[in-house]
């Protein structure tokens, strides 16, 4: 590695961080880039603040040690094999073999991977099938301010969704089992990755709140359960409400109490897909994203976005915020492209400091919590007058799958910060060609210099490394290893993988990717049968 890619990356990242003071924490946010942290918490002891900096920035002590050592410290060169080993450490792949009413599942297989920037990683992912109803759920959960909220949502949201879809009769059986202390009917069949974690200590508390939810559904007396769109809408909002209420209720168990506080005061965006035959529903709250890779009748590929990012660049989202708050706050709702100047996404689970009144926050935090040990962020943004400013209400999109819909990509914003929608589709199609699944058809558009340049770059990149077997890994490789021209740079890729922990997060986010491949023959059968 030259002297050196990682050194340049560190200096670039360090100069793009600004510091705000809030309570006993230093809250940092990117000064100019939209592709940086959402919430970021540091203990004052872990920072060396440099007030004389022309950028008003700071040097991390650990990172500063790297900048003050000799250049040979940055000459760690990974071999191509070591790079691939690091990239593939978190990958997972599953084939779907079950049948639905005699017709093969519309999902053929799915592949996922995750690359951490935070330590510990704040992203979560999940895949589960509904046992009492039909359908498979896929979810990406992007945490901020810690991993606690993303962890909780990844474990609990699918249960709320599955219960929402249950018939009145099934819910009665669930309630009867609880009343008679008998085993519950199975709700979900999880497809867990070996690295997935779970909070077993609070399962009973979560079950109690899930039971209250299904009791309320029973009171609605709906024979067939909620529609999929209603189920997604209610599940997101009900879980977020429970997260908020759980920490307000008296809890005697110290572990549960502390964890509930961490969940409520951290946050998570979520993007969830429910696939039932040809029926695809997407629910999104925040800036994760879902897109479809579509191959037209002429063989040309295109991208079909299924979500909209809920952030300051979404005019519809800005209009929603203005409708929900007084006109006097129009100029302060978004400051520096962030909600109240502190949060990039405008929808998220948790983050009660942007939902509760100041009085409620103070009352909860004064109930004997060790907020210092729990690293709870105590900061009220300026212009905080009419909460809530944040919501977990999702936007739900329905799409009827067609034989030309070949794959679905769900990913946290760490991927979309690096690659646009069209790049992602192009890379997945190229991956399919390399691993022999499918030969991509040439676009029938007239050739032009830009198109020819793109083809040349693809050919050049393909010779730099052996083909990844996992599409999600392939996307992550290109997300962090490609330059501004779309060319794969092995030196850049190695540098991005060897950055110190405290520097890596300044330059990129956690990246979690899931690619769901559809069974075109099965979908065609659904269409023929009506």
UniProtKB/Swiss-Prot annotation:
InterPro entries: PP2C, PP2C_BS, PPM-type-like_dom_sf, PPM-type_phosphatase-like_dom. Belongs to the PP2C family. It is found in: Mitochondrion. Keywords: Hydrolase, Magnesium, Manganese, Metal-binding, Mitochondrion, Protein phosphatase, Transit peptide. This is [Pyruvate dehydrogenase [acetyl-transferring]]-phosphatase 2, mitochondrial. The keyword Transit peptide applies. Mn(2+) 2 binds at residues 142, 413, 509. Gene3D superfamilies: PPM-type phosphatase domain. It comes from the Eukaryota. Its cofactor is Mg(2+). One of its GO terms (biological process) is response to starvation. Its EC number is 3.1.3.43. Mitochondrial enzyme that catalyzes the dephosphorylation and concomitant reactivation of the alpha subunit of the E1 component of the pyruvate dehydrogenase complex (PDC), thereby stimulating the conversion of pyruvate into acetyl-CoA. Acts as a crucial regulator of T cell metabolism and function, with a particular focus on T-helper Th17. Residues 1-67 form a transit peptide. It comes from Rattus norvegicus. Binds 2 magnesium ions per subunit. Mn(2+) 1 binds at residues 142-143. Its main location: mitochondrion. Mg(2+)-dependent protein phosphatase. Phosphatase activity is increased in the presence of spermine, a naturally produced polyamine. It catalyses: O-phospho-L-seryl-[pyruvate dehydrogenase E1 alpha subunit] + H2O = L-seryl-[pyruvate dehydrogenase E1 alpha subunit] + phosphate. Highly expressed in liver. GO terms for cellular component: mitochondrion. Residues 107-518 form the PPM-type phosphatase domain. GO terms for molecular function: [pyruvate dehydrogenase (acetyl-transferring)]-phosphatase activity; metal ion binding; protein serine/threonine phosphatase activity.
